[in-house]
UniProtKB/Swiss-Prot annotation:
InterPro entries linked to this entry: Disintegrin_CS, Disintegrin_dom, Disintegrin_dom_sf, MetalloPept_cat_dom_sf, Peptidase_M12B, Peptidase_M12B_N, Reprolysin_adamalysin
Organism name: Craspedocephalus gramineus
Signal peptide: 1-20
Protein name (database record): Zinc metalloproteinase/disintegrin
Gene3D superfamilies, sorted: Collagenase (Catalytic Domain), Disintegrin domain
SS bond list: 308-386, 348-370, 350-353, 413-428, 415-423, 422-445, 436-442, 441-466, 454-473
Top-rank lineage group of the source organism: Eukaryota
Motif stretch (Cell attachment site): 458-460
Keywords of this entry: Cell adhesion impairing toxin, Disulfide bond, Glycoprotein, Hemostasis impairing toxin, Hydrolase, Metal-binding, Metalloprotease, Platelet aggregation inhibiting toxin, Protease, Secreted, Signal, Toxin, Zinc, Zymogen
Subcellular location: Secreted
GO annotation (BP), single: proteolysis
SUBUNIT field: Monomer.
E.C. number(s) listed in UniProt: 3.4.24.-
């Protein structure tokens, strides 16, 4: 049973006496200081997790009480999630961290139907929430008082005086010839109910971004996790589940030549994915995060309609803003191009939606109707195969009940009847020495050797192979 952590916030709001403060998100002129105080109410005998599945916060904004409901984002990581960095001698070092008890949440404000929230609870509360049509950010204050947080509107963050930042995709650039203009579409309400799709993301951080954050891999990792948490939330409107499959940090040197020319860098990254990356990681769409300043104020670029293509299912994004959400909007924008979307035009009646060509001063987390039409057409015309595969059963989390043939929260294996020799029936944990309990790539409690066929192809499709690192049968990245 999912436990609910009730947190009452004793809020003290102090008007700031001064010109501004500097936070990780930027310089602020107007903000509120809040002091959260946790009061936990768990049922008798319940075991408290480090990060609860559900949380509730009560506090005030502009003197008015609000109740923030949060639920852990269960779909954030793929079952075979890996983190990769490099040793000084260039060796690839891969880790498979346990991410079940992570600290990333989605939520809403009570009695506000249009509200949303994306919050990290890793080190205090950090993220954003939408309240009465306005976006607020919250983050810890780096003061001696560790409980102090700042709450502020996005519009109150001082903006740099620089030309508008924009996407580098030109209309019809590298698009499939059969992608139609939104004005030509006749999409019925039935079609608008998008079929469920699943995108496994690979994020690759270049050496420039690694240097930008002083070689602090932990800080970069948390930042990327927050980005994916935001992307996951934005893509729900399209009935797309986005999970992070691999995070690779180029800690020693760049593995491609990252140039100021966005088109050149994108071409090089796509070629590298096709020839190198797909041979060693399982993912559907790869993005390069870079600190490089591209020519022409460009902050991102991606092939239109490239999803599932070995060379074109890619995007490049500049880490252009201290606020995670703003960069996440750009990442979602570029992935939108891969899903067949063009930029919003005047007829779309939305100059601040995700697919706007120029980054808005008030970034939106919504897709326009034009974008939805483009996406529907892309699915109809091309039916990209790599995003059809549903998450493995370990992505399904519910109340732990032994023997229901699902891996539940806290279970390593299903310990129902008949008895699983790899599974301790008392704890639903793997027995000592066991790597797995079941799955197409599990045999006698061990992962099956890499390269073994685990799913035979149908028709003109391709066989799927075990990777030697997980019990699931990963989707062949070269599927059409």
């Amino acid at each position: 049973m999912i436990q609910v952590l009730l947190i009452t916030i004793c809020l003290a709001v102090f008007p700031y006496q001064g010109s501004s403060i500097i936070l990780e998100s930027g310089n602020l002129n107007d903000y509120e200081v809040v002091y959260p105080e946790k009061v936990t109410a768990l049922p008798k005998g319940a075991v408290q997790q480090k990060y609860e599945d559900a949380m509730q916060y009560e506090f005030k904004v502009n003197g008015e009480p609000v109740v923030l409901h949060l639920e852990k984002n269960k779909g954030l990581f793929s079952e075979d999630y890996s983190e990769i960095h490099y040793s000084p001698d260039g060796r690839e070092i891969t880790a498979y961290p346990s991410v079940e008890d992570h600290c990333y949440y989605h939520g809403r404000i009570e009695n506000d139907a249009d509200s949303t929230a994306s919050i990290s609870a890793c080190d205090g509360l950090k993220g954003h929430f939408k309240l009465q049509g306005e976006m607020y950010l919250i983050e810890p204050l780096e003061l001696s008082d560790s409980e102090a947080h700042a709450v502020f509107k996005y519009e109150n963050v001082e903006k740099e005086d620089e030309p508008p930042k924009m996407c580098g995709v030109t209309q019809n650039w590298e698009s499939y010839e059969s992608t139609k203009k939104a004005s030509q579409l006749n999409v019925t309400p039935e079609q608008q109910r998008f079929p469920q799709r699943y995108i496994k993301l690979g994020i690759f951080v270049d050496h420039g971004m690694y240097t930008k954050y002083s070689g602090n891999s932990e800080r970069i990792t948390k930042r990327v996790h927050q980005m994916i948490n935001n992307i996951n939330m934005m893509c729900r409107a399209l009935n797309i589940v986005t999970t992070l499959s691999v995070l690779e940090i180029w800690s020693e040197k760049d593995l491609i030549t990252v140039q100021a020319s966005a088109p050149t860098t994108l071409t090089l990254f796509g070629a590298w994915r096709e020839t190198v990356l797909l041979n060693r990681t399982s993912h559907d769409h790869a993005q390069l995060l870079t600190a490089t300043i591209f020519n022409g104020n460009v902050i991102g670029r991606a092939p239109v309609g490239g999803m599932c293509d070995p060379k074109r299912s890619v995007a490049i994004v500049r880490d252009h803003n201290a606020i995670v959400f703003v960069v996440a909007v750009t990442m979602t924008h570029e992935m939108g191009h891969n899903l067949g979307m063009h930029h919003d035009e005047d007829k779309c009646n939305c100059n601040t939606c995700i697919m706007s060509k120029v980054l808005s001063r008030q970034p939106s987390k919504y897709f326009s109707e034009c974008s939805k039409d483009y996406y529907q057409t892309f699915l109809t015309n091309h039916n990209p195969q790599c995003i059809l595969n549903a998450p493995l059963r370990t992505d399904t989390v519910s109340t732990p009940v032994s023997g229901n043939e699902l891996l539940e929260a806290g279970e390593d294996c299903d310990c129902g009847s008949p008895a699983n020799p790899c599974c301790d029936a008392a704890t639903c944990k793997l027995i000592p020495g066991a790597q797995c309990g079941e799955g197409l790539c599990c045999d006698q409690c061990s992962f099956i050797e890499e390269g073994t066929v685990c799913r035979i192809a149908r028709g003109d499709d391709l066989d799927d192979y075990c990777n030697g690192r997980s019990a699931g049968c990963p989707r062949n990245p070269f599927h059409a």
